[in-house]
Amino acid sequence: MLPDKYVKSNYLKNLRSATNEFLDSNPDLTKSYLYLLLFLYDLEFFTISWVAENYGMNKKNLSDRMIYPLLSSGYLYKHFDKLTPSQTLEDHLFRDETKYNYRVRYAMSQKGRLAVQRFYASLNSPDSSI
C-alpha cells in the first residue's frame, strides 16, 4: 500500500463500485442507459440523429434500444414534437423546417437529471452509499 502522501484525490477511483451501487438502487437503469444519460446531461435538447452520430451508435439501434426505453421510463421526454406550436414571432418568421423535414427534439427530464446528479455525488463520496 502506498503512503497517503503519494495518493491523490481522484473521484474516478470509485467509478466501478459507485456504478454498481447506483445500478443496484435503480433497477430500471442499465449501465448503457447510465452512460447515455451522462453523455446527454449537459444538452438542453437533442435529436436522435445527432446523438447517434456523436455517441457512435447506429441510429436505429440507439432509438429502439436506448432512447425509447428511457423515454417510457421517464428519464427523457419529447421537448419539441411535430405538433408543438411555436409561441414566438421569431420562430414563425425564421423557421427553416417544414413538416416534411422536421425532427423531434428530446430532452432529459428532471428524473434523469436528478439521477445523474446522484451518480456524480456518489463518485465524490469516499463511502459511495447511494
At which residue positions do the language-model features occur?
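Short glycine/proline-centered loop/turn elements that form peptide/ligand docking sites
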Residues: 26-30, 46, 63
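Short amphipathic alpha-helical interaction segments
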Residues: 56-72, 77-81
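Short, Lys/Arg-rich nucleic-acid/phosphate-binding segment
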Residues: 80-105
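Short, amphipathic alpha-helical interaction segments positioned at domain boundaries
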Residues: 96-130
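Short, locally clustered residues in the helix-turn-helix/winged-helix DNA-binding domain
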Residues: 34, 38-42, 120
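Short acidic, hydrophobic short linear motifs in intrinsically disordered regions
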Residues: 45-54
